[in-house]
Swiss-Prot record:
PROSITE patterns: TRUD (PS50984), UPF0024 (PS01268). The active site is at residue 80. One of its GO terms (cellular component) is cytosol. It catalyses: uridine(13) in tRNA = pseudouridine(13) in tRNA. PANTHER family: TRNA PSEUDOURIDINE SYNTHASE D. This is tRNA pseudouridine synthase D. Pfam families: TruD. Belongs to the pseudouridine synthase TruD family. Keywords: Isomerase, tRNA processing.
Length: 339
């Protein structure tokens, strides 16, 4: 699936091999919500460090310890299990004392902060994540250094990676069967997973087509472009001067986007329209399920991107906004194998 997608850096697969997540400590993620806890309110907020632990499993254990329903537990995003991750959880406990979480015990879990907050921490309510990744066995080479410089300066394809599609692409396979009327899907969680996989596939294919045509840094007629630093976007139609927009793109004032298909999707560039039309079953499914079309940047540039070669391999440190995948960046640098 992902292995079929083209590369942006050097237009070829990386020559360097590396192990990813050989140890949990090789993949460190720290969540950034973008706001501070209020210090009071009906929600107990917990900042937790997890090692080799599933987000939902830990959340359920915290809720059970506090004596509240799992429905009253919240978090901003699911984190990788095979990793060391830090993230916030909240428990709705109006009029109740904060439990003594110093008595909470769970292998691989350390509660770093306990406070209060005045609203629920909801899925998606985060700005991004800080990453500290060790690529074991990655040796210094001219080719790898060129790739590192490229990613630092120009970014990487903002692909959705394997975890979006389920084990061996199961979610995408089921989405196609659903779209073709072969199955019915009643479970709400499965419906969400399958719809996300289908939209992600179309997005990836549009990005891949732009790379194949050498159009990742070129504003095409009818492109949908996004203002940098916001989610506002507009169409590069006949009312817009493409020459002016091209300068704005090169100055990183605007970003090219690709679609997460759904209702009210706009006709865009010919490249994009061709891909969407080739997958009309998915397009129809999104409209049937009343999914609203949204835009996502075609490329992503990591903030604070730095690297260092160590005896064990290559260490990367960077920040990505919510929704972008660290593994999409890593695949531009090395041919990695996950342990």
């Amino acid at each position: 699936m992902l292995e079929q997608l083209p590369y942006l850096a050097l237009k070829t697969p990386p020559k360097t091999t590396a192990l990813l997540k050989a140890e949990c400590a090789d993949f460190i993620v720290k969540e950034h919500l973008g706001y501070e806890m209020s210090g009071d309110g009906e929600f107990v907020a917990l900042y937790v460090r997890k090692t080799d632990c599933n987000t939902l499993f830990v959340g359920e254990k915290l809720a059970k310890f506090a004596g509240v329903s799992e429905r009253n537990m919240g978090y901003a995003g699911l984190k990788d299990r095979r990793a060391v991750t830090e993230q916030w959880f909240c428990l709705q406990m109006p009029g109740m004392e904060t439990p003594d979480f110093s008595q909470f015990e769970l292998d691989g879990v350390e509660i770093l902060t306990v406070t209060r907050h005045n609203r629920k921490i909801r899925t998606g309510s985060l700005e991004g994540n800080y990453f500290d990744i060790l690529l074991r066995g990655a040796e210094e080479s001219d080719e790898l250094k060129v790739r590192l410089d490229f990613v630092a300066n120009f970014g990487f394809p903002n692909y959705f990676t394997e975890q979006r599609f389920g084990r061996e692409g199961h979610n995408l396979t089921q989405a196609l069967r659903w779209a073709q009327g072969e199955i019915k899907v009643k479970d709400r969680k499965k419906r969400s997973f399958y719809l996300s996989a289908a939209r992600s596939e179309i997005f990836n294919l549009v990005v891949a087509a732009r790379i194949a045509k050498g159009a990742t840094n070129q504003v095409l007629p009818n492109d949908i472009v996004q203002l940098a630093g916001s989610h506002s976007w507009f169409k590069a139609d006949e009312k817009e001067d493409l020459t002016v927009l091209q300068v704005r793109l090169e100055n990183q004032d605007i970003l090219l986007t690709a679609p997460l298909i759904g209702e009210d999707i706009l006709a865009a560039s010919d490249i994009e329209n061709e891909i969407v039309n080739q997958h009309s079953a998915f397009d129809s499914l999104m409209k049937q399920e009343r999914m609203k079309a949204v835009r996502r940047p075609l490329l992503m540039k990591a903030k604070g991107f730095s690297w260092a070669f160590e005896p064990e391999g290559l260490r990367l440190k960077f920040y990505l906004p919510a929704g972008s995948y660290a593994t999409a960046l890593v695949r531009e640098l090395v041919n990695y194998t996950e342990e």
